[in-house]
Curated annotation (Swiss-Prot):
Class of enzymatic activity (EC top level): transferase
Family indicated by similarity: Belongs to the RNA polymerase beta chain family.
NCBIfam families noted in UniProt: PRK00405.1, rpoB
Function of the molecule: DNA-dependent RNA polymerase catalyzes the transcription of DNA into RNA using the four ribonucleoside triphosphates as substrates.
Substrates-to-products reaction catalysed: RNA(n) + a ribonucleoside 5'-triphosphate = RNA(n+1) + diphosphate
InterPro entries: DNA-dir_RNA_pol_bsu_ext_1_sf, DNA-dir_RNA_pol_bsu_external_1, DNA-dir_RNA_pol_su2, DNA-dir_RNAP_su2_dom, DNA-dir_RNAP_su2_hyb_sf, RNA_pol_bsu_bac, RNA_pol_bsu_CS, RNA_pol_bsu_protrusion
Protein name per its UniProtKB record: DNA-directed RNA polymerase subunit beta
EC number in record: 2.7.7.6
Gene coding for it: rpoB
PROSITE patterns: RNA_POL_BETA
GO molecular-function terms, A-Z: DNA binding; DNA-directed RNA polymerase activity; ribonucleoside binding
Originating species: Shewanella denitrificans (strain OS217 / ATCC BAA-1090 / DSM 15013)
Length: 1343
């Protein structure tokens, strides 16, 4: 493998044995691609804005003399960029402008004569845009729209599993689900009649539906039944024989062949053997007794031609009297319906008998009554309603997906078709459900991923946009029909409010629009790849059963079987598997390698769950020889959702990678194959809660996916083009681009600005720091700067800690963790949290609030950290209760005497009219102010601090743009100098010229002169561009802010809190091994090895066997080996050994392992590169052990041996307190530990007095309300059991809801008098009132 300069800094030793045929696709593509499809112009009009507009326009007036047509649309440019939107708290969006054409027709002239056409561009609201990282900025906060897994449109056949009826009979049902429109259900009842429901309303006999579709009784019988023909003889009947129809019946008469021989005797059951004999004897007719026809049903009406009397009606049971009538009328042949109990049920025939309607009109009226109960039906209304239900394109749409699924299920050849239903469609569904009831077909599996599809952002946004457009359509149609249209323009007809409201509602408050989880890069990526079955049009937690939540065979390679939340949402919220993607229909696909005649090719095909069932698919870990031919005879594979063994020649596809079945979070767990699934689930979920530490530390034992994840998450800065690093500081990196990657006529400089100390959604700190140096070559895709939780471009969520598995004085009882003081001293788990506190000055009824340092009744010391505008300084260290922003609010006017009014008028306002409503630091928070933002309403005068901040921002913008201009200008000038040098100018002559005069020289060579002129032109463009950019920036900074109504000013203060690790904080490994820190132990008391090195963390060995997450033990051994190798390399560097020796040792390390694919050609590295690599390996050699394809036990032992450690991975430890050796050897090594965002500082709080609940007068609960501890029913029992009467009394009275008692108690304590007088608890009064509300008068007699 070829490594770039920056990749050579630190190479991860990979133990993977399988070749990667396919790289993991871009992780955020599900979000970005979906939204791109929505916003991109689509000439076909099948999706996005185009589809929405075409589905609603043209809008015709009721009279038909005017219409509004859609021409085209255009998305404008956003006013503010993403960062500005986040600071200002506005939505990152672009205006949508639509070109509309209003056409007026001449009323007098012939139809369709155009009188007037007006075209105009109309504003249709702002559409939120997606950022490059797949998020939306809504009102200044980053949000993610989670994709939804919902039931695909189409037709589904199912049964009730025998739960509906007490007999346990299985009732079948069919449901046609459109993309939008009414649902149509067909279902059997316990008596086997078929019913229809529309939109889950009252059921009607299904034949009503057929009658409404203009089928007569006769048509219905012909559609669903075969006929049996009988010829009427004198004493008997002759039946036309179809032998197969007799199967399973008991012969009630002797069945004879054509030659008269008896084939089946009366009373015998007719079997397949008899039928075969009948077929062979070529018997076409069979003589049967007259009573054989009794009980069968007529297939048509039989009419006496002379009288016109109906002798036997279609679908009526035939009796002997009927037969006699037919004979008398001279009818020689009669057809009956072929019905049997085995596989040709009388379902439709029975249903027709329940059906009270006889013609189409009656059927339509019946449907109208069911849909609109209580309204008198008319013929037109009934017809219009039925037509609109399933046959109108405006009201009903199966969609492309629905039509495809519908046609495939009903075995119709083509996938394309109409979006509305046809008569044939409905009949086909009824035929299919009868087939299923007769046992010819199976019901569908609702949880199969071929029946559930993904709805992503773009599609959901389009649907909301269409909802808004439909609301507009109604208003436009009314306006088109009113008044004089000659004066109006399209703009006057359209009101964009409903569209904006629909879109805003979706992005702001939809269940699937979620506040982005921004704890660390992994949690961001996982959130964007989440697939939820909840949400509008989806399931609800309460109704979702076990089957929906369970892992389904079709999840393989599509949804992760491991990563899902614990709790009520388990199985309803899933994560996309690493390689999965959605196809054009919205079904999940996963890639497979094609296998031809037992040989694996490199051709990769994506298959959806529907297609996958047809093929035989082998796993990725099968043995192959050097040519790619499968070695084993019988190969483990999957076919139709079952695991089985097949011959190599039968295999058609093979997995692309062992990691393909799991999600990104699960594939970050090393040795995942040795962990129990439940613990792996916790491990995957807890990595998302890891807080970025102060200094990120790459995992020694990783899986090789860390780099992909860090780059795709967007938190690191990646080189857009190759080149050489020209300039680096903490906030910007400048790269001089390679000549061969330049676009013609550009300066060839790329500038990357870094994000510094900003707040994430979870209050963690986002900060980028450069990881490259000036002069380093970079190629496209190299990481230039690390973000939060990344180290040299690799994801680094925690720290590598030296751990020992042993009990230690009970301090690691029940998963507690004992850590060394050194961990805290070295700031290994110190994190920075940034809080945003805002102070809003409003315009109140009594006057406006004011932000000022002049606050009543506050001492000088409290104002010491405020400037003259009343706003805290940047850099001030503040603690709970300190004032951050001074604010005063006008008090209600007290009634003044005339004298006071006079004094007030003479001496002006007194400070007594205002009360202090300043912004203070919340209790238990201590930190440093790192930034202040002031937003002032347009038209309100800015205070001194706001102007200072504005000046600072303008100066910063000028500096940034100036430096950018300088760098770009230098690029142009250096190219001009090189041109002049090549044209014969000497270095000395160039040195004499003023800097910019190189552009105005004259050269003899015409081509070079043209090039020089181009450069001069480019320089002018740069200058103009700089002025324009600066002016835009300055205008944005100085303009007033658009604040909410009634708000005059907002001050936002950002407070950075540094949190060191302490007892009570939650920590975890990556294998679901979580615990709480019980004690921070002095270094000298920690167990240490024979060389005197103490361990950092002591874990309880009892946490491993019962949890079955052995992966952690293997990780510890591998970590010990990795660190040991690092120590050896450190020793070599310190002893300044020969580079050849160093190179040899490193080579030995990278070549270790059986069949390991990775080949690192250390021999091709220069000496400098070897030393630089060795320097980066000093802390330990990073290792990749991919999931299901990782290092084996033997390889771990080889690594330990290479590091000079015992192969058992166990050491003799000594007790730090006594110096004695422990009796047994202890497993010691390195584990990657995470600090989770469950910090004790955020949970602990204390209260003496505070706020009380209004009704019960009991203290509130929870830290947010500054509440108390609940002393509940069971705690009362405990005190009663102890007989602690006085303690119990004070708990239930003065400490809780005895209002007078508690105030008195407070006074007594202040006075030093420690006595209490308990009174009546308020909750007792509440109880009395409750009883009275039931109409029982209850009074308390106090004697």
């Amino acid at each position: 493998m070829v490594y770039s300069y920056s990749e050579k800094k630190r190479i991860r030793k990979d133990f993977g044995k399988r070749p990667q045929v396919l790289d993991i696709p871009y992780l955020l593509s599900i979000q970005l691609d979906s939204f791109k499809k929505f916003t991109d112009q689509d000439p076909t009009g099948e999706r996005g804005f185009e589809a929405a507009f075409r589905s609603v326009f043209p809008i015709k007036s009721f009279s038909g003399y005017s219409e509004l047509q859609y021409v085209s649309y255009k998305l404008g440019e956003p006013v503010f960029d993403v960062k500005e939107c986040q600071i200002r708290g506005v939505t990152y969006s672009a205006p949508l402008r639509v070109k509309l054409r209003m056409v007026l027709f001449d009323r007098e002239a012939a139809a369709g004569t155009v009188k007037d056409i007006k075209e105009q561009e109309v504003y249709m609201g702002d559409i939120p845009l997606m950022t490059d990282n797949g998020t939306f900025v809504i009102n200044g906060t980053e949000r993610v729209i989670v994709s939804q897994l919902h039931r695909s449109p189409g037709v589904f056949f199912d049964h009730d599993r025998g739960k509906t009826h007490s007999s346990g009979k299985v009732l079948y049902n069919a449901r046609i689900i459109p993309y939008r429109g009414s649902w149509l259900d067909f279902e059997f009842d316990p008596k086997d009649a078929l019913f229809v429901r529309i939109d889950r309303r009252r059921k009607l006999p299904a034949t009503i539906m057929l009658r409404a579709l203009e089928y007569s009784t006769q048509d219905i019988l012909d559609l669903f039944f075969e006929r049996i023909q009988f010829k009427i003889k004198k004493d008997s009947l002759v039946m036309a024989l179809v032998p197969d129809r007799l199967r399973g019946e008991t012969a009630s008469y002797d069945i004879k062949a054509a030659d008269g021989s008896v084939l089946v005797e009366a009373g015998r059951r007719i079997t397949a053997r008899h039928i075969k004999q009948l077929e062979q004897s070529n018997t076409t007719e069979l003589e049967v007794p007259v009573d054989y026809i009794v009980g069968k049903y007529a297939a048509q009406d039989y009419i006496d031609e002379d009288t016109g009397e109906v002798l036997v009606s279609a679908n009526n049971e035939i009796s002997l009297e009927d037969l006699a009538k037919l004979s008398i009328a001279g009818i020689k042949e009669i057809d009956t319906l072929f019905i049997n109990d085995l596989d040709h049920g009388a379902y439709i025939s029975d249903t027709l008998r329940i059906d009270s309607t006889t013609n189409r009109l009656e059927a339509l009226v019946e449907i109208y009554r069911m849909m609109r109960p209580g309204e008198p039906p008319t013929k037109d209304a009934a017809e219009a309603l039925f037509q609109n239900l399933f046959f109108s394109e405006e009201r009903y749409d199966l969609s492309k997906v629905g039509r495809m699924k519908f046609n495939r299920r009903l075995e119709i050849a083509e996938d394309e078709g109409n979006g509305v239903l046809s008569k044939d469609d409905i009949v086909c569904v009824m035929k299919k459900i009868i087939e299923i009831r007769n046992g010819y077909d199976e019901v569908d599996d609702i949880d199969h991923l071929g029946n559930r599809r993904i709805r992503s952002v773009g599609e959901m946004a389009e649907n909301q946009f269409r909802v808004g457009l439909v609301r507009v359509e109604r208003a436009v149609r009314e306006r088109l029909s009113l008044g004089d249209l000659n004066e109006l323009m399209p703009q006057d007809l359209i009101n964009a409010k409903p569209i904006s409201a629909a879109v805003k509602e979706f992005f702001g408050s939809s269940q699937l629009s979620q506040f982005m989880d921004q704890n660390n890069p992994l949690s961001e990526v996982t959130h964007k790849r989440r697939i939820s079955a909840l949400g509008p049009g989806g399931l609800t937690r309460e109704r979702a059963g076990f089957e929906v939540r369970d892992v389904h065979p079709t999840h393989y390679g599509r949804l992760c079987p491991i990563e899902t939340p614990e709790g009520p949402n388990i199985g309803l919220i899933n994560s996309l598997a690493s390689f999965a993607r959605t196809n054009s229909y919205g079904f999940l696909e996963t890639p497979y390698r094609k296998v031809v005649e037992g040989v694996i090719t490199d051709e990769v095909e994506y298959l959806s769950a529907i297609e996958e069932g047809r093929y035989v698919i082998a796993q990725a870990n099968i043995e192959v020889d050097s040519t790619g031919r499968m070695v084993e005879e019988q190969i483990a594979c999957r076919h139709k959702g079952e695991s089985t063994f097949m011959r190599a020649a039968d295999i058609q596809y093979m997995d692309v990678s062992p990691q393909q079945i799991i999600s990104v979070a699960a594939s970050l767990i090393p040795f995942l194959e040795h962990d129990d699934a439940n613990r792996a689930l916790m491990g995957a979920n807890m990595q998302r809660q890891a807080v970025p530490t102060l200094r990120a530390d790459k995992p020694l034992v990783g899986t090789g996916i860390e780099r992909t994840l860090a780059v795709d998450s967007g938190v690191v800065v990646v080189a857009k083009r190759g080149g050489v690093v020209d300039y680096v500081d903490a906030s910007r990196i400048v790269v001089k681009v390679n000549e061969d990657e330049l676009r013609p006529g550009e300066a060839g400089i790329d500038i990357y600005n870094l994000t510094k100390y900003t707040r994430s959604n979870q209050n963690t700190c986002i900060n980028q720091r450069p990881c490259c140096f000036v002069g380093e070559p970079v190629v496209r895709g190299d990481v230039l700067a690390d973000g939060p939780s990344t180290d040299l471009g690799e994801l680094a969520l925690g720290q590598n800690m030296r751990i020992a598995f042993m009990p230690w004085n009970g301090y690691n009882f029940e998963d507690s963790i004992l850590i060394s003081e050194r961990v805290a001293q070295e700031d290994r788990f110190t994190t920075i949290h940034i809080q945003e506190l805002s102070c809003i000055a409003r315009d109140t009824k009594l006057g406006s609030e004011e932000i000022t340092a002049d606050i009543p009744n506050v001492g000088e010391s409290a104002l010491s950290k405020l400037d003259e505008s009343g706003i805290v300084y940047i850099g001030a260290e503040v603690k709970g209760g300190d004032i951050l922003v001074g604010k005063v609010t006008p008090k209600g006017e007290t009634q003044l005497t005339p004298e006071e009014k006079l004094l007030r008028a003479i001496f002006g306002e007194k400070a007594s009219d205002v009360k202090d409503s300043s912004l203070r630091v919340p209790n238990s928070v201590k930190g440093t102010i790192i930034d202040v933002q002031v937003f002032t309403r347009d038209g309100v005068e800015k205070d001194k601090r706001a102007l200072e901040i504005e000046e600072m921002h303008v100066a910063q913008a000028r500096k940034d743009l100036g430096e950018e201009f300088k760098i770009l200008e230098e690029g142009v000038l250096s190219r001009a100098r090189n041109l002049l040098l090549s044209a014969g100018y000497s270095e000395a002559k160039l040195a004499e010229l003023p800097r910019k005069d190189v552009l105005i020289q004259v050269i003899d060579d015409e081509a070079k002169q043209t090039e020089l002129e181009q450069l001069a032109e480019q320089h002018e463009e740069l200058k103009a561009d700089f002025d324009k950019k600066f002016e835009i920036k300055r205008r944005k900074i100085t303009q007033g802010d658009d604040l909410a109504p009634g708000v005059l000013k907002i001050v936002k203060v950002y407070l950075a809190v540094k949190r060191t690790i302490q007892p009570g904080d939650k920590m975890a490994g990556r294998h679901g091994n979580k615990g709480v820190i019980s004690k921070i132990c002095p270094v000298e008391d920690m167990p240490y090895d024979e060389e005197g090195n103490p361990v950092d963390i002591v874990l309880n060995p009892l946490g491993v066997p019962s949890r079955m997450n052995i992966g952690q033990v293997l990780e510890v051994h591998m970590g010990a080996a990795a660190k040991g190798i690092g120590n050896k390399i450190t020793a070599m560097l310190e002893e300044q050994r020969e580079i050849a020796e160093l190179r040899g040792y490193i080579k030995q390390v990278y070549e270790l392992g059986d069949d390991v694919l990775q080949r690192v050609d250390i021999d091709s590295f220069s000496d400098d590169e070897v030393v630089r690599l060795a320097t980066h390996l000093k802390g330990g050699i990073p290792i990749a052990t991919p999931a299901f394809d990782g290092a084996k036990e033997k390889e771990i032992k080889q690594m330990l041996a290479l590091a000079g450690l015992p192969e058992s991975g166990q050491l003799t430890l000594c007790d730090g307190r006594t110096g004695n050796e422990f009796e047994r050897k202890v497993t010691v090594g390195y584990m990657y530990m995470l600090k989770l965002n469950h910090l004790v500082d955020d949970k602990m709080h204390a209260r003496s007095t505070g706020s009380y609940s209004l009704v019960t007068q009991q203290p509130l609960g929870g830290k947010a309300q500054f509440g108390g501890q609940r002393f509940g029913e069971m705690e009362v029992w405990a005190l009663e059991a102890y007989g602690a009467a006085y303690t119990l009394q004070e708990m239930l009275t003065v400490k809780s809801d005895d209002v007078n008692g508690r105030t008195q108690m407070y006074k007594n304590i202040v006075d030093g008098n420690h006595q209490m007088q308990p009174g009546m608890p308020e909750s007792f009064n509440v109880l009395l009132k409750e009883i009275r509300s039931l109409g029982i008068n209850i009074e308390l007699d106090q004697e």
